[in-house]
């Protein structure tokens, strides 16, 4: 990945609220299925905004930090997704999204970020991201002191 897009906690919450507003009325949903691990924080934010208490997970592994690898389903939520929102942080090349669609064909699949290759596979997303850009999520970063450029 040649570029990086840094996401702050504030930005993530703003984007999640925007996405939640598109999922109203909340009463239409039985629950949320968060895609582990990237969808866990967005899933919690959507659950808060929509007042949803039933939150489950589907655990899929496809990355080692910034290296994509073979898809592995570790754990899945039951059912076909009817009445559920499935949420992930990002749709990238679409590998995970294809697996999600197969597991939960009746769910509404949403992400905060979407790259061009994966956009057609999700029902909704908030932010367009170029395909060659790596997203640095706030849960992967720490706040550190950075000395001034002048050194004083």
UniProtKB/Swiss-Prot annotation:
Keywords: Cell inner membrane, Cell membrane, Glycosyltransferase, Magnesium, Membrane, Metal-binding, Purine salvage, Transferase. This is Xanthine-guanine phosphoribosyltransferase. Guanine binds at residues 92, 135. Its cofactor is Mg(2+). Its EC number is 2.4.2.-, 2.4.2.22. It comes from Cronobacter sakazakii (strain ATCC BAA-894) (Enterobacter sakazakii). Purine salvage pathway enzyme that catalyzes the transfer of the ribosyl-5-phosphate group from 5-phospho-alpha-D-ribose 1-diphosphate (PRPP) to the N9 position of the 6-oxopurines guanine and xanthine to form the corresponding ribonucleotides GMP (guanosine 5'-monophosphate) and XMP (xanthosine 5'-monophosphate), with the release of PPi. To a lesser extent, also acts on hypoxanthine. It catalyses: GMP + diphosphate = guanine + 5-phospho-alpha-D-ribose 1-diphosphate; XMP + diphosphate = xanthine + 5-phospho-alpha-D-ribose 1-diphosphate; IMP + diphosphate = hypoxanthine + 5-phospho-alpha-D-ribose 1-diphosphate. InterPro entries: PRibTrfase_dom, PRTase-like, Xanthine_Guanine_PRibTrfase. Pfam families: Pribosyltran.
């Amino acid at each position: 990945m040649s570029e990086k897009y840094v996401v702050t906690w504030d930005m993530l919450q703003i984007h999640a609220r925007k996405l939640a507003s598109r999922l109203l009325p909340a009463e239409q949903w039985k629950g949320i299925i968060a895609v582990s691990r990237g969808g866990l924080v967005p899933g919690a934010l959507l659950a808060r905004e929509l007042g949803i208490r039933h939150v489950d997970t589907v655990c899929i592994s496809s990355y080692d930090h910034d290296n994509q690898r073979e898809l592995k389903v570790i754990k899945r939520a039951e059912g076909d997704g009817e009445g559920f929102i499935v949420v992930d942080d990002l749709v990238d090349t679409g590998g995970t999204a294809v697996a999600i669609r197969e597991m939960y064909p009746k769910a509404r699949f949403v992400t905060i970020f979407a790259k061009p290759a994966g956009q057609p596979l999700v029902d909704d997303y908030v932010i367009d991201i170029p395909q060659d850009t790596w997203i640095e999520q706030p849960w992967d970063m720490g706040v550190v002191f950075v000395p001034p450029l002048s050194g004083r």
